[in-house]
Amino acid sequence: LSGGIDSPVAAYRMAKRGLALDHIHFASPPYTSERAKLKVKALAQKITPYTGSTNLFVVPYTKPQEYIRDNAPDVLFTVLMRRSMMRIANIIARKQGCEALVTGESLAQVASQTVKALQCTDAAQDLPILRPLIGMDKEEIVTVARRIGTLETSILPYEDCCTVFTPK
């Protein structure tokens, strides 16, 4: 649950199909603020009517992110960060008895969401990855977010760990 528009919609769509969900959020203080974490908690609350009771795991991600930033070429930063997140999510999911990971990715919405990039992040762990938004465009996702009541919270301007170190 990143704090953006897509992940709550992905959770909603999977809950609609009967999937029980836990959420994982990656926080990178001091680069991400307490307000950003509160935003994610608010989003988790807003989708509770659809998902039922869930756990929210907040993963401190500053050190891995700094390590990748300091040691990887800029061109690989995003894919290496996503692979690292997938590995961590896999560990948490297995400990919780989860059978799959769910992401809010949609194909080719951003450069890290090409088929090749998705294959690369998938290969970092061994659970099935469900992507309920894969064929949706941003307008369709925003329409669902508005309908389920998450859009206004999702667009609050707090930083998330996926963008704070993105190479310029």
Predicted segments, located by residue:
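Small/polar glycine-rich anion-binding or flexible loop at a beta-alpha turn
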Residues: 107-109, 157-165
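ATP-dependent adenylation/pyrophosphate-handling site
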Residues: 1-38, 162
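Conserved active-site and cofactor/substrate-binding residues in soluble primary-metabolism enzymes
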Residues: 9, 35-42, 59, 76, ...
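Active-site adenylate/phosphate-handling loop in enzymes that bind or generate adenylated species
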Residues: 65, 71-143, 147-148
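A conserved beta-strand->alpha-helix junction
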Residues: 43-71, 158-161
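Structural beta-sheet core signal
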Residues: 23-25, 58, 103, 131
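A short alpha-helix-loop-beta-strand transition element characteristic
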Residues: 149-157
